Amino acid sequence: AETFPNLSDEVRREKWQAMIDTEEESLPHYLQHVSGHKTLINMLERILAANEEILQLPKTVLLREFGDGAMSKLDRYSAIVWPNEKRQFDQSTEGNFVGVGIVIREGNTGEILVVSPIDGSPAYYGGVVPEDIITHVNGSSTSGWTVNDAVDKITGKRGTSVTLTIKRETEEESLDLTLTRDRIILRSVSGWNKKSISESGEPIWDWYIDPHNHIGYIKLTGFSKSSYADILAAIRDLQEIGEPNGLILDLRYNPGGLLPTARQISNLFIQEGSIVSGENANGDMLFDMRAYENRAYLADWPLVVLINQGSASASEIVSGAVQAHGAGIIVGQRSWGKGSVQTVHNLGADALALVKLTTQLYRLPAIDGKPGRLVHKREGSSD
């Protein structure tokens, strides 16, 4: 009410609610005579016009409320990716961005707090450390900023500079750190222990959790466009030391990512047959992703896949396919249960926002002639 004072006016609220009720009651009639798309456009135009008269809320606020409300009626994974969220969405799928390479969050009192610099990034080499508080960006105070505000100001074109004013517990005075923005690679693959950082800024991993018995370890934190290539690079590093006698693939707390990447990684361990299929709400098969024998580079390696309640979507495809084909042993806890496919559509010609719409469900490969399981969470299910 402080931000939008008209919301505290009871007369205006009642008038607004009456208008919304009228539109809702009229909707079935309009749909009988006009196409659904045209009906909704006309309704939205009337609502926006009424808002100008009654509540006078910013158009962006109203559109977001109606947009999020509409998507919430579908399922938990269908959503609008708004302009202020699109950058983070793109980063999660592309696996890279331009910036200085710091992970930040909002502190207990609203300050912009550094969680950690990314290995090999400008922030890493520039002296930023965990628990630093960013008080200014290019001289502008961060007081009252959200994390998104800070990201907007800190990121920019590659090769340009940004000055962060840092408050550090071990220093009496603030520090000004000028960093040059660069392309930051978000690695989704790591080993058992980070031994050092290379001259190019890449972490050097110890890939053997048990050197004596030659048991390798690879942790995968997401399924981005670069994850498959990163796993192949890790495998080459393993083999340079010696041929492994087994591999642990750690998918704990991996929320998933890109379906094609899940298929590629599954195929490393599976020589033939289905990896995952997709079906619509009627149970009709829409696709069947299958393994290629010439890409099953690791099919002969003994494999253990670690999962927990934080393993979802693409993680469940990989672990489920490995289990169905007997290509490895699954160890851990019941996974999250996110077995739906979202297709992404641009909103508008300039694609400043996106719509994620659930269109399919995953089905794992059949086991012993029985139909494969749907991955999607079901109330009361124990598997």
Language-model features: where?
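Terminal targeting/pro-maturation regions of precursor/exported proteins
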Residues: 1-78
